[in-house]
Amino acid sequence: MDQDREQGSALDPRYDAAGLVTAVVTDHRSGEVLMLAHMNAEALAATLESGEATFFSRSRGRLWKKGESSGNVMRVVEARIDCDQDAIWLRCEPAGPACHTGERSCFYRRIDRDGPTLVRTIEV
């Protein structure tokens, strides 16, 4: 156990072999999970400096500011890191849908336990 990393007060992310940490984004009001993405050191620094969520796109191989083309930015209300500093939690105020499909959350389908099918969820 790396006690300084796990219990200390210094931000010292534990990046994986690709230089990334997982980032979970939730709505700061409802707590709903909006999306999951990845951040490298540059994306984390840009997020903390600007107050708007920036990620590293594995498919594009570059930084990606959420909403850069759609306008659906994620204003960061609070950023947290887990106990061993390999995952980031961003509590955000979304300016629009989080998902590229237009859905509020990227997690808009549930997996039916009775078979390998996806069922669209209905917001209450």
Curated annotation (Swiss-Prot):
Q: Which domain of life is it from?
A: Bacteria
Report the main location listed first in the record: cytoplasm
Q: Which GO terms describe its biological process?
A: L-histidine biosynthetic process
Q: Indicate which residues the UniProt annotation says bind Mg(2+).
A: D82, D84, D86
Tell me the keywords, alphabetical order: Amino-acid biosynthesis, Cytoplasm, Histidine biosynthesis, Hydrolase, Magnesium, Metal-binding, Zinc
Reactions catalysed according to its record: 1-(5-phospho-beta-D-ribosyl)-5'-AMP + H2O = 1-(5-phospho-beta-D-ribosyl)-5-[(5-phospho-beta-D-ribosylamino)methylideneamino]imidazole-4-carboxamide
Q: Which residues cross the membrane?
A: none
Gene3D superfamilies, per database record: 4.10.80.70, Phosphoribosyl-AMP cyclohydrolase (3.10.20.810)
One of the record's GO molecular function terms: magnesium ion binding
Q: Where does Zn(2+) bind?
A: C83, C99, C106
Report the pathway entry: Amino-acid biosynthesis; L-histidine biosynthesis; L-histidine from 5-phospho-alpha-D-ribose 1-diphosphate: step 3/9
Instruction: Tell me where it resides.
Output: Cytoplasm
Identify the HAMAP family for this entry.
HisI
The subunit structure is: Homodimer.
What PANTHER family does the annotation carry?
Answer: HISTIDINE BIOSYNTHESIS BIFUNCTIONAL PROTEIN, HISTIDINE BIOSYNTHESIS BIFUNCTIONAL PROTEIN HIS7
As for what it does, the entry says: Catalyzes the hydrolysis of the adenine ring of phosphoribosyl-AMP.
Protein's name in the database:
Phosphoribosyl-AMP cyclohydrolase
Give the source species: Rhizorhabdus wittichii (strain DSM 6014 / CCUG 31198 / JCM 15750 / NBRC 105917 / EY 4224 / RW1) (Sphingomonas wittichii)
- The gene behind this protein is hisI
